């Protein structure tokens, strides 16, 4: 006999007596269904059970659906049977646990496997092991030691990358002697070089923050017990003076905006477009660079393609080294290209940069292309510019009151 299994939205319309509920929007749906004596499969994204979510710092991981990191530890530490269900003796209604792996941004089988392993191994253990028997430290040791079994079967899998606290970036700008700190999402050996050569398992072992005083290149990777290494990260360290502000008088609020119709995949195509640029006034909110799309744009049909440029000045509040992040096609400051996402899937960004800026006004230009790359419509992206001083922990969006034009 057939029996219905449905996502937890079916709770909203009343359940047939034999319906099984898949609780994906947290655990509340599963608890509610079990209280009604319905069987449940637990699969909440909040429990690290969506394998298409990032498993490391999204600023250096391959692009996938925008999401908070679902580290291996998060998946492993998920407990499928909520305490509420245990206290009521309704454990029998929790049939099991499931991971999901949506594939919109998995363009190859290798990428699919990379997202699945080793978190699918954690899924097996949380499904079969009593909570009191679980030990993440021991699990991680076994995963790392037995990765050779995956290698023998030519299975791609995730090896945690060396990450920087508060957001990884392949460019580090300094104005004085400092240190560069790295960490991994679980305890792992890291090796590095400072002479431009590619590190090997026998290279210097990272044991403390790396001292930097001038221009140099850090190459760093993690190493498994087998000697297999992660992708090597290359971090360019550059000593800069604060770029001077410009002296501009009689400025007005906002950036000057212009648009041009057409389907553009490269910024230089704007220079050879047949259409004419249209003056669109001024904007203080960068999302206003976008235009409203037809109702069926969510299905990726009927979109109005165009390019847009907003330019003027940005007011930097104080001297400092600033880390920059944006999903714009390009961002220019002081007539220098500081962020370049050209051709990238804008679901995420691996193009963060850093620059030393003096307090005051600096020329700025934002380039936006309304197109679809890798299945991601660029109009889904938030077009803000985020900045973080090197002594701050969080990025914040630049406020509209910081933009000016002549």
Residue spans of the language-model regions?
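Active-site neighborhood of glycoside hydrolase catalytic domains
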Residues: 1-32, 36-37
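Active-site beta-loop-alpha junctions enriched in small/polar residues
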Residues: 9-11, 24-26, 45-47, 100-104
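Histidine/acidic-residue-rich catalytic or RNA/ligand-binding cores of hydrolases
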Residues: 15-16, 51-59, 109-113
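Substrate-binding clefts and catalytic carboxylate motifs of secreted carbohydrate-active enzymes
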Residues: 60-176
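Short, compositionally stereotyped local motifs that mark structural "simplifiers"
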Residues: 134, 140-268, 274-312, 321, ...
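Short beta-strand-plus-loop segments that form exposed binding edges in beta-rich domains
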Residues: 365-375
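Edge beta-strands of jelly-roll/beta-sandwich modules across compartments, strongly enriched
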Residues: 373-385
